[in-house]
């Protein structure tokens, strides 16, 4: 209980705000691909491209967002991005042309990429090392509490048939921003680490680029993200278009809710076990589980199989995302945590390529041929395993060398 009492009030604001923010987002964004294909008449590949626009912009924006938060402080970056988010969701509600959805979702990715590195770095700044794993996982749990209710609300309000439900996230992010601004005013002593203030963006980029272990792991994490992206892009299109699946849109909404429930049920037991090992071990196992979940789709699409797919995928998701922030926090150079949390945003390349490749597979093979669609997607995801294994091996060797130097007699 003492660890819980050590959590800063602003950290609690971010955690609680995340619940409502993700609830609002998950009642709208996951249904966007279905809305674009069913109502707007877009092809599956174009719908995938619109979904990918968010992550595409985020690849570079997250690094700059993290760097700026290191240089000028977390507060301004978080407030600008969260009120920008409010306007973005209002834009979704007003959109009627396909190109507008592309632009607005790109801006959605920009706001997310600026807010998240700054908020994660702020959580790290305000938390003692012994409590950081708890704080990062409370934030992750908050995401999934929101996702338990969001898809159900999305089905109720008809998010796959109208853009009006996007007004709900607009209101919620506006309120979240106001509460956050009041908390910053109440606790005005927050500032950026001093070391990064005199470092140019090019110098900050070179620091992360020359970090060999970080770069190798980043490639593996990107391929994990490729697999993870299929759940919110290819899965809903496949479920809605497969002629053998009745009421696929409703079933997909229930899959999202089951996903969030399984996360909440398994997250802390898995983390309690996984914290005994390197975060890279969790990332490797998570990669394998996500790949297996897609492989199951190649042989069956019945309700029991779908439940098994969601459970397997979700365990992989927990292993990936419960330890990823801790890995970045551990490997980040002093004074550059925002930059490192931003640099991990380059892994969003997987979220750009994933929906696009998934959409192409559906267009190419047809939703009635899951064996081809998900064999390709599962195989690409599994390519991340060798990179993570290599990074783990190198990290283990460096740790051994460091211990040997410390134990060497003078």
Swiss-Prot record:
Short name of any one Pfam family annotated for the protein: MFS_1
Coiled-coil annotated residue ranges, if any: none
Family in the record: Belongs to the major facilitator superfamily. TCR/Tet family.
GO molecular function: transmembrane transporter activity
Gene Ontology cellular component list: plasma membrane
Protein name (record): Uncharacterized MFS-type transporter YqjV
InterPro entries assigned to the protein according to its UniProt record, in alphabetical order: MFS, MFS_dom, MFS_trans_sf, MFS_Transporters, Sugar_transporter_CS, Tet-R_TetA/multi-R_MdtG-like
Keyword set includes Membrane: yes
Record-linked SUPFAM superfamilies: MFS general substrate transporter (SSF103473)
Organism field: Bacillus subtilis (strain 168)
């Amino acid at each position: 209980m003492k660890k819980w009492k050590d959590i800063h009030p602003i950290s609690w604001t971010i955690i609680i705000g995340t619940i409502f923010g993700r609830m609002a987002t998950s009642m709208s964004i996951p249904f966007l691909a279905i809305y674009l294909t069913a109502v707007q008449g877009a092809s599956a590949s174009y719908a995938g491209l619109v979904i990918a626009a968010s992550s595409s912009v985020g690849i570079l924006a997250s690094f700059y967002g993290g760097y700026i938060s290191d240089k000028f402080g977390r507060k301004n970056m978080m407030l600008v991005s969260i009120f920008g988010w409010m306007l973005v969701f209002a834009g979704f509600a007003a959109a009627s042309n396909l190109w507008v959805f592309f632009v607005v979702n790109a801006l959605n990715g920009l706001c997310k990429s600026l807010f998240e590195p700054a908020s994660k770095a702020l959580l790290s700044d305000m938390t003692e090392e012994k409590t950081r794993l708890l704080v990062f996982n409370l934030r992750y749990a908050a995401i999934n509490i929101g996702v338990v209710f969001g898809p159900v609300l999305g089905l109720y309000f008809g998010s796959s048939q109208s853009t009006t439900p996007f007004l709900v996230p607009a209101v919620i992010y506006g309120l979240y921003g106001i509460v956050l601004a009041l908390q910053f005013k109440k606790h005005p002593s927050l500032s950026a680490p001093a070391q990064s203030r005199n470092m140019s963006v090019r110098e900050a980029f070179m620091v992360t680029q020359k970090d060999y272990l970080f770069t190798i792991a980043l490639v593996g994490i990107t391929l994990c993200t490729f697999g993870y992206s299929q759940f919110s892009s290819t899965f809903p299109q496949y479920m809605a278009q497969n002629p053998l699946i009745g009421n696929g849109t409703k079933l997909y909404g229930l899959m999202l809710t089951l996903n969030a429930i399984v996360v909440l049920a398994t997250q802390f037991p898995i983390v309690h076990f996984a914290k005994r090992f390197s975060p890279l071990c969790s990332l490797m196992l998570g990669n394998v589980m996500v790949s297996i979940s897609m492989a199951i789709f190649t042989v069956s699409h019945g309700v029991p199989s779908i439940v098994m797919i969601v459970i397997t995928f979700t365990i992989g998701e927990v292993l990936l995302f419960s330890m990823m922030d801790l890995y970045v926090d551990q490997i980040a150079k002093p004074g550059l945590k925002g930059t490192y949390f931003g640099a991990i945003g380059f892994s969003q390349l997987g979220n750009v390529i994933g929906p696009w490749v998934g959409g192409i597979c559906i267009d190419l093979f047809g939703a009635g041929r899951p064996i081809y669609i998900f064999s390709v997607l599962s195989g690409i995801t599994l390519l991340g395993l060798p990179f993570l294994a290599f990074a783990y091996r190198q990290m283990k060797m460096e740790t051994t060398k460091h211990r040997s130097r410390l134990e060497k007699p003078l």
